[in-house]
Swiss-Prot record:
<keyword id="KW-0945">Host-virus interaction</keyword>
<keyword id="KW-0597">Phosphoprotein</keyword>
<dbReference type="GO" id="GO:0039592">
    <property type="term" value="P:symbiont-mediated arrest of host cell cycle during G2/M transition"/>
</dbReference>
<comment type="similarity">
    <text>Belongs to the papillomaviridae E4 protein family.</text>
</comment>
<keyword id="KW-1048">Host nucleus</keyword>
<comment type="subunit">
    <text>Assembles into oligomeric complexes. Interacts with host CDK1. Interacts with host SRPK1; this interaction may favor expression of late viral transcripts. Interacts with host cytokeratin components KRT8 and KRT18.</text>
</comment>
<feature type="compositionally biased region" description="Basic and acidic residues">
    <location>
        <begin position="104"/>
        <end position="114"/>
    </location>
</feature>
<comment type="function">
    <text>Contributes to multiple aspects of the viral life cycle including viral genome amplification, suppression of suprabasal cell differentiation and egress of newly formed virions. Induces host cell cycle arrest at the G2 phase by associating with and preventing the nuclear entry of host CDK1/cyclin B1 complexes. Inhibits cellular DNA replication by preventing loading of host replication licensing proteins MCM2 and MCM7 onto chromatin. Within the cytoplasm, associates with host kinase SRPK1, a splicing factor regulator, and inhibits its activity.</text>
</comment>
<dbReference type="GO" id="GO:0030430">
    <property type="term" value="C:host cell cytoplasm"/>
</dbReference>
<keyword id="KW-1035">Host cytoplasm</keyword>
<feature type="compositionally biased region" description="Basic and acidic residues">
    <location>
        <begin position="1"/>
        <end position="28"/>
    </location>
</feature>
<keyword id="KW-1121">Modulation of host cell cycle by virus</keyword>
<feature type="region of interest" description="Disordered">
    <location>
        <begin position="83"/>
        <end position="114"/>
    </location>
</feature>
<keyword id="KW-1079">Host G2/M cell cycle arrest by virus</keyword>
<keyword id="KW-0244">Early protein</keyword>
<protein>
    <recommendedName>
        <fullName>Protein E4</fullName>
    </recommendedName>
</protein>
<feature type="compositionally biased region" description="Low complexity">
    <location>
        <begin position="29"/>
        <end position="38"/>
    </location>
</feature>
Amino acid sequence: MANDKEIAQTESGSHPKDLKETLQEKKPSQPSLSLLCSAPPPAVPSEQASVGYGTVLARTPTIFLQARGALFSALPPPRAGHGTGGLGIKAGRRGAVARLHRGRTSDSPKAHHQ
């Protein structure tokens, strides 16, 4: 009779003790070597970028992802050249144009004699 009760308990499998044992078997406390061997090797960031997934979005730097000259853009608008103060390409040349109209250029021999 005692054997019948034990058999019925093991067949049902509803013991909390059995449930804990199966959960512990499924979740190892330390990573096993078989898990490391079965996992695919991590992709190199350049490979992730070429496919377009992963931590790297693309090969383009993030400063180019927003429109130029936008409110929080890292890049100035395309018309702003160096030394123009954001006024355009011709703004930096106004001094040189004024010298040309006055006849004083840096490569002119007259500029040195006047």
